[in-house]
Amino acid sequence: MSDSLERLYLAVLAARDLDPATSRTARLFQRGPSKMAKKLAEEAIEVVIDAVNGDTDAVVRESADLLYNLTVLWASAGVRPEDVWREMTRREDMLGIAEKLPKSAMKLPKVASPRVAARRPIVALEGRTARKRH
């Protein structure tokens, strides 16, 4: 699976500088991270709806779209697939592959990365309340 995502990532990088009039990927890069995030969220919702409805074939199709849009967002943010695999390995080493790390105050070892200085800090969203839009 990681090979497929790596190939997709490389294809996304190659397509980002193509003509936005003919390349969906280039168009997403032209529109920026907000549009990329919106497309990613839309695909995630479609996967959830299809899963709840029991439409396995649609879940597969929409999951492929979700992974494509996630890969585009990764490329825009300077995240490489191997960065994600390294984090998954770190989590597996700590808790096992089937566990999600808690968001609590648990101190976790930092992963060394040559690009750490270029990344924006992660901001915790816990404790925030959702506002209704009118």
From Swiss-Prot:
Pathway: Amino-acid biosynthesis; L-histidine biosynthesis; L-histidine from 5-phospho-alpha-D-ribose 1-diphosphate: step 2/9. The gene is hisE2. One of its GO terms (molecular function) is ATP binding. It holds the Pfam family PRA-PH. Its EC number is 3.6.1.31. It catalyses: 1-(5-phospho-beta-D-ribosyl)-ATP + H2O = 1-(5-phospho-beta-D-ribosyl)-5'-AMP + diphosphate + H(+). GO terms for cellular component: cytoplasm. GO terms for biological process: L-histidine biosynthetic process. It is found in: Cytoplasm. It comes from Bradyrhizobium diazoefficiens (strain JCM 10833 / BCRC 13528 / IAM 13628 / NBRC 14792 / USDA 110). Belongs to the PRA-PH family. This is Phosphoribosyl-ATP pyrophosphatase 2. Keywords: Amino-acid biosynthesis, ATP-binding, Cytoplasm, Histidine biosynthesis, Hydrolase, Nucleotide-binding. Signal peptide: none annotated. InterPro entries: HisE, PRib-ATP_PPHydrolase-like.
